[in-house]
Amino acid sequence: MDWDLNAAGAWDLAELEQDHAAAAPSSGGHAANAAAAGTGTESRPPAPGAAGAPAECSVDLKLGGMGECEPGAARREREAAAGAAKRPRPAGPGGQQQQQCPSCAVDGCRADLGKCRDYHRRHKVCEAHSKTPVVVVAGREMRFCQQCSRFHLLAEFDADKRSCRKRLDGHNRRRRKPQPDTMASASFIASQQGTRFSPFAHPRLEASWPPGVMKTEESPYHITHQIPLGSSSSSRQQHFVALGAATPAYAKEGRRFPFLQEGEISFATGVVLEPPAAAPACQPLLRTGAPSESSGAGGSKMFSDQGLARVLDSDCALSLLSAPANSSGIDVSRMVRPTEHVPMAQQPVVPGLQFGSASWFPRPQASTGGSFVPFCPAAVEGEQQLNAVLGPNDSEVSMNYGGMFHVGGGSGGGEGSSDGGTSSSMPFSWQ
């Protein structure tokens, strides 16, 4: 398709001529109106068809803003008039206008703070003197603190932190504030005396007590001696003899603990062992014998090695679960003579048994004995095969032993207690 450039140019020229012709009468009409206003007459606008051409035929883009442009001279005059209308600043005390930019507070400093940052202008210090170690302000040597933005004396200043000490103390106090929970726990732990905590509360020591009455780590009571079950009888005999030789003097004399009431258990002499011999599988572990040379109390109960060897070497489990269903409690209290206190060995005969004070069973003062039912293998079922172990009265028991305790109110004999009286057995697990 070919374009006719001449025809397009002719159309543009014709359109421009029409616009120019329409603008000429309009400007003439405005001039006539102005003249009429000066003379007091009113003029009317010309008719639309007076020019002979349509007035609305022009096509233009009304972008706006072009008519608001004014010459530079007029704009300058308007800005000058607005500046004159502003109120002037009040004069200072001396009648002169106040200085716009403050000077540095350091003596002899004439630095222009107008070129510095607003921080330095507000605090009246130049950038150089804000970091100087020593400056003279009002005749005194001071230093500018960058933390509180003030001048301080050298005595109040910390050179390492580049800050005043007063502000540093408050800052450290706020950051290192001690916690109340931590202080309470620390004071509680510090108040506890001793090397370790014990699950049982011990009584306080009294001045009237004999020395060594409390168990300590150096005491032979504190040492745990373990005897292997597979060891021979001779090695076990030597082991128990060594324990008897290590018995302290206050235990050999049969002294009681002062904090125990009358009628309670007291410690007795050391262990006296005898060589093993042929005996039933459930021979008693306690017997009544003559006191040894190292013993201080006569007629005390001693442990025998005969029944111990058979029990340790036995294949039967030392548990109540292996006991036969038809076995009953055995009363063995009639052949032991009555004593006020039932002495007891210092170390457990069978490993794992505890004769400690935490496991003792207290009894009233009227009770002087008890009945004890040891566990026997399944081959022994009768009551007649077990001799006496403890006191003649079977009312209560006051000794802790791994096995079974017999508590009843019978007449005191073995047959009488099983036939006439009502008895009950309390099982205790081996410890």
UniProtKB/Swiss-Prot annotation:
Residues 18-55, 68-102, 408-431 are annotated as: Disordered. PROSITE patterns: ZF_SBP (PS51141). One of its GO terms (cellular component) is nucleus. Zn(2+) 1 binds at C104, C109, C126, H129. Residues 408-419 have a biased composition (Gly residues). SBP transcriptional regulator probably involved in the domestication of maize. Acts as a transcriptional repressor binding to a 5'-GTAC-3' motif. May repress the growth of lateral branches in length and numbers. Zn(2+) 2 binds at C145, C148, H152, C164. It holds the Pfam family SBP. Keywords: Metal-binding, Zinc, Zinc-finger. The keyword Calcium does not apply. Monomer and homodimer. The N-terminal domain is necessary for dimerization. Strongly expressed in immature ears and weakly in husks. Found in the inflorescence meristem of the developing ear, in the spikelet pair primordia, the glume primordia, the cupule forming region and other floral organs. Not detected in other tissues. GO terms for molecular function: DNA binding; zinc ion binding. A single Lys to Asn substitution at position 6 is the probable cause of the transition from the hardened fruitcase surrounding the kernels in teosinte to the cob that bears naked grains in maize. This substitution is not affecting the DNA binding site specificity, but increases the stability of the homodimers. InterPro entries: SBP-like, SBP_dom, SBP_sf. It comes from Zea mays (Maize). This is Teosinte glume architecture 1.
